[in-house]
């Protein structure tokens, strides 16, 4: 959505996103989660035009200067370079609905000090490390040295049981959101284990209200950090290792914004 908006603004085009119906789940929950105040009825629908694909993950400046009108964008577009010039509009759209924002904000403000967060993406990548490597605990330990020792730290994860079993995360500074609901449908992880995926809205809202971040190689925590709007220091894993050995053909050099800190890691 953000990159679509950025490209449309650069080309002075109208734009559309799919509406919610029985085939399209509310555009991945955008309207369920965010205010989306810049989306008008005329922005909902489909374009009967050519497909224009981004295949390699890197920033392609020609999208901002040459993208033809009446096009459907396909790809990840996972870099803020497509929408950095309209970042204020994206932040406005991605304002959380009050039902999420108010209780999360109340909780954050109840803490003695502004927290940071770290994101452990674990369970859905087990057995798939050749595509999505799992960051070791040592990576988070090294990153936390960039923050004062008494800074509270939320641990957001898709594997709460594993994190809480690790001695490292038993330190008093770590906080967990343990009341996360799950989707009704189930997905399968790399080891064939079926599970109900966690609902993301509350965790993402809490991430956005923190004052610093240690993200995983994940677009979820990438957005959690970006939505902080430069409120604190953001540390990211080396983008060259964002994906595993089976995906070395992808150019990930533009995923991490220049103002964020990059940390190396190894198993």
Roles of regions detected by a PLM:
Residues 3-7, 139-146, 162, 206:
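Amphipathic alpha-helical segments that form well-ordered structural scaffolds
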Residues 148-250:
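Donor-binding and catalytic core of enzymes assembling or modifying cell-surface/extracellular glycoconjugates
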Residues 11-16, 147-153:
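Surface-exposed helix-capping loop/turn segments at secondary-structure junctions
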Residues 1-20, 24:
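N-terminal pre-catalytic "stem/leader" segment of glycosyltransferase-like enzymes
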């Amino acid at each position: 959505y953000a990159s679509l908006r950025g490209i449309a603004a650069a080309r002075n085009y109208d734009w559309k996103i799919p509406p919610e119906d029985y085939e399209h789940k509310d555009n991945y929950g955008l309207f369920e989660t965010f205010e989306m105040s810049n989306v008008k009825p005329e922005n909902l629908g489909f374009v009967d035009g050519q497909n224009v694909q981004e295949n390699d993950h890197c920033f392609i400046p020609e999208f901002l200067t040459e993208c033809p009108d009446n096009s459907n964008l396909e790809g990840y577009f996972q870099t803020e370079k497509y929408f950095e010039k309209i970042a204020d509009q994206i932040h406005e759209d991605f304002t959380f609905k009050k039902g999420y924002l108010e209780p999360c904000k109340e909780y954050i403000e109840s803490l003695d000090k502004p927290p940071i967060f770290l994101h452990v993406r674990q369970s859905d990548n087990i057995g798939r490390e050749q595509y999505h490597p799992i960051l070791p605990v040592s990576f988070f330990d090294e990153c936390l040295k960039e923050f004062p020792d008494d800074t509270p730290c939320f641990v957001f994860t898709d594997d709460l049981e594993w994190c809480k079993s690790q001695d490292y995360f038993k330190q008093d500074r770590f906080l967990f959101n343990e009341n996360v609901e799950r989707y009704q449908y189930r997905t399968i992880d790399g080891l064939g284990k079926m599970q109900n995926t966690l609902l993301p809205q509350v965790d993402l809202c809490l991430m956005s209200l923190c004052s610093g971040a240690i993200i995983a190689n994940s677009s979820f925590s990438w957005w959690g950090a970006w939505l902080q709007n430069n409120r604190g220091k953001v540390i990211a894993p080396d983008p060259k290792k964002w994906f595993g050995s089976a995906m070395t053909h992808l150019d990930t050099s533009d995923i991490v914004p220049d103002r964020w800190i990059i940390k190396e890691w190894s198993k």
